[in-house]
């Protein structure tokens, strides 16, 4: 993990919690976005925890540059309040999720592990709530991309937007989990989405998923 935040106390708190876990380690810290990009390129962390508001280079542009690395790390953006438009901008720039700075330690660790796993669920529940309240405007490009999906792929994408894991989707459709993984791979490829969160953003932009849609059915 790489911690990028201009507040040293925030970094120290996150480091203490993360380093207490046997499967997680903080490999570096940065106090501004530009240094965060440099360290991400040098250290190649699996996950970057990125503040949105920072000097020199803000977290949105830093996220865009970090996720352009090859291979790109996952990015979790930090925000001080739940429905932050900057958090949505960071997700559109490439972040996989966002996390409140005052999240409980167990929530933070669960979010980091979820994002690191990549294909577990779309992101912490706060991310879906953000998309519901600050739903991206309809985008004809997104509509055209979603139109290339098969009916089953659209059904899987809707299930992904509800935060379901591959196993939960497989159980719902009574198919093997490997079949769902194949569908997800096709969806990401057709939508040119980097990960599940980006695919879900496109689903909102195409109005395949709308704010207030149920998370279960």
Regions found by a protein language model. Name each.
Residues 43-49:
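Active-site beta3 strand of CheY-like receiver
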Residues 10, 55, 83:
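The feature encodes the CheY-like receiver
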Residues 85-92, 96-97, 102-151, 155, ...:
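Short, flexible helix-to-coil linker/hinge segments that flank and couple to helix-turn-helix
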Residues 32-35, 56-61:
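Acidic catalytic/metal-coordinating carboxylates
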Residues 5, 51, 79:
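Active-site residues of response regulator receiver
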Residues 188-217:
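Basic, Lys/Arg-enriched C-terminal extension of HTH/homeodomain DNA-binding domains
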Residues 38, 60-72:
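Short amphipathic alpha-helix used as the core "switch/output" element in two-component signaling
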Residues 163-198:
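Recognition helix of helix-turn-helix DNA-binding domains
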């Amino acid at each position: 993990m790489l911690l990028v935040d201009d507040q040293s106390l925030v970094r120290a708190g996150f480091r203490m919690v993360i380093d207490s876990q046997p499967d997680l380690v903080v490999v570096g810290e940065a106090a501004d976005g530009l240094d965060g990009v440099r360290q991400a390129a040098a250290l190649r962390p699996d996950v970057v925890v990125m503040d949105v508001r920072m000097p020199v280079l803000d977290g949105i542009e830093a996220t865009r540059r970090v996720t352009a690395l090859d291979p790109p790390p996952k990015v979790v953006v930090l925000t001080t309040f739940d429905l932050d438009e900057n958090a949505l901008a960071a997700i559109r720039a490439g972040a996989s999720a966002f996390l409140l700075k005052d999240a409980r330690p167990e929530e933070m660790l669960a979010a980091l592990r979820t994002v690191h796993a990549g294909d577990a669920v779309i992101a912490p529940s706060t991310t879906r709530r953000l998309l519901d309240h600050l739903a991206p405007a309809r985008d004809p490009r997104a509509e055209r991309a979603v139109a290339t999906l098969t009916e089953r792929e659209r059904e899987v994408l809707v299930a992904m937007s509800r935060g379901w894991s591959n196993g939960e989707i497989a159980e719902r459709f009574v198919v093997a989990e490997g079949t769902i993984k194949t569908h997800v791979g096709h969806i990401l490829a057709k939508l040119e989405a980097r990960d599940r969160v980006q695919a879900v953003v496109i689903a909102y932009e195409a109005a395949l998923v709308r704010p207030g849609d149920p998370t279960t059915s």
